[in-house]
Amino acid sequence: MELAMDNSYAFNQRSTCNGIPSEKKNNFLVSEDHGQKILSVLQNFREQNVFYDFKIIMKDEIIPCHRCVLAACSDFFRAMFEVNMKERDDGSVTITNLSSKAVKAFLDYAYTGKTKITDDNVEMFFQLSSFLQVSFLSKACSDFLIKSINLVNCLQLLSISDSYGSTSLFDHALHFVQHHFSLLFKSSDFLEMNFGVLQKCLESDELNVPEEEMVLKVVLSWTKHNLESRQKYLPHLIEKVRLHQLSEETLQDCLFNEESLLKSTNCFDIIMDAIKCVQGSGGLFPDARPSTTEKYIFIHKTEENGENQYTFCYNIKSDSWKILPQSHLIDLPGSSLSSYGEKIFLTGGCKGKCCRTVRLHIAESYHDATDQTWCYCPVKNDFFLVSTMKTPRTMHTSVMALDRLFVIGGKTRGSRDIKSLLDVESYNPLSKEWISVSPLPRGIYYPEASTCQNVIYVLGSEVEITDAFNPSLDCFFKYNATTDQWSELVAEFGQFFHATLIKAVPVNCTLYICDLSTYKVYSFCPDTCVWKGEGSFECAGFNAGAIGIEDKIYILGGDYAPDEITDEVQVYHSNRSEWEEVSPMPRALTEFYCQVIQFNKYRDPWFSNLCA
């Protein structure tokens, strides 16, 4: 058949009027329901059994259809028709792993763009959308199942999502199982969990168990459930148990009760090594799962006379304070305190009779800085010397990153006019060794350091003393602990800050600063190097303490005037930008040490007799 156009009038010829050419006109036509009309026509073809060009062969039925519809809806069929496959030329494909009901349901969706997902058919749709690679339908099934996750079906959905490759459903189901782990691990479905999924469960920090011992019991129970086929996995699963967080007694019992299984799977030596680790370095591992620990804010203050000490702790969960027994911590003027695992480290300071108050301490004519490092073990209430730093220092800061203690800035032994130290050192608590790392880009005074993942941010001033004492916050450094590289950031604060009146804290891997002079909180965006205002708190004393825990910032104590010191504690909830007051400290304090520390519940020395 040949179609021809009558060219008696040339539509593209520009007409003239009185010698003046008229403008050429055009209209752009858009039919908004064009796609739906095409689908309706194709569905009519299907109902009338016309223009079919392909067949799906089932075990008990042959279903005719149109290639264009299959290819438009399914990546499986599109790939089949694009490449030189036998089915393309034969005009048919045989499918054996889907039922006729499933294929017809898929075709109904493909021709109409509509279907109804229910509890009864969602698994069928999930299976066919996975096999036929219908992404929109697969996501709809995944979203439907995510909303239905509960204690009864979560393990089944975890298995289904793993089989069908639904990352979103798998992540949601995995999170649910991890959160309710202690309620699920005794079920028969749990014992049927495949190795890969169990491994994923166990490696998470968020695994909700009352103690790490439960994780070890789960691994042994799962292995014994089908010992012949599963014992090969035991070494891999044992690695996911944080054995160094267990008590020596628990590990010894495991050796005694499971000796045969452990030896046959080459796991006996793993437990033996863990026992040696606990004996030599117990409490020096910061990787305890949050659900197995109690978290505290540790407060310590030595008065100017060097004799009166105040030490107490705040239990995050119970909002209660406890006055701690005398620890006799040697916190020299200008020293720095950091927590690591279940231990507290004190570095440096001045051995002479320097003033403890910062503004008076910096004015001393001579600083007899020390290189000593002390470790305090609250579990044993023991305070002892460890390896000395390479360089004596005072008025520095210390912070933990990559399981090492870093000491940054400050001044070494000498007269008041010596410059700030550029040398930076790191200490490995397990090997008990100090090493030098890359130096600071330039000198910094009043350093504040915070760690966000493996990056240390350091803020401070480039000058030590100004006429008004309060030097400006004009130094901002970034240290990548993984690559041992420093970089200097542009301090785009948007306003003036005093270096001695800000506190830097990390919250959920984000750096925040609290300005104690304006009562405002700012967060830092590492991509743009810009500080964003996050809100204001009611008030805060100068020289207050500030701590970041999970999604919260705690601001504690401080002074409004030399004779007006406060015991107030305020909490900023970063996830909802709200402030609240919590229980006040047992005593009003200013210029004190403030750190977060956590203990395994089974050896928590501060848990009992908490009092406000």
Swiss-Prot record:
Pfam families: BACK, BTB, Kelch_1
InterPro entries: BACK, BTB-kelch_protein, BTB/POZ_dom, BTB/POZ_KBTBD3, KBTBD3_BACK, Kelch-typ_b-propeller, Kelch_1, SKP1/BTB/POZ_sf
GO molecular function terms listed in the Swiss-Prot or TrEMBL record: ubiquitin-like ligase-substrate adaptor activity
Any one Gene Ontology cellular component term annotated for this protein: cytoplasm
Kelch-type repeats, residues: 295-341, 343-403, 404-454, 456-506, 552-599
Domain (BACK) ranges: 154-254
Organism taxonomic ancestry: Eukaryota, Metazoa, Chordata, Craniata, Vertebrata
Top-level taxon of origin: Eukaryota
All copies of domain BTB, residue ranges: 52-119
Disulphide linkage map: none
Matching Gene3D superfamilies: 1.25.40.420, Kelch-type beta propeller, Potassium Channel Kv1.1, Chain A
Full protein name: Kelch repeat and BTB domain-containing protein 3
Natural source organism: Homo sapiens
Keywords of the record: Kelch repeat, Repeat
GO biological process, one term: proteasome-mediated ubiquitin-dependent protein catabolic process
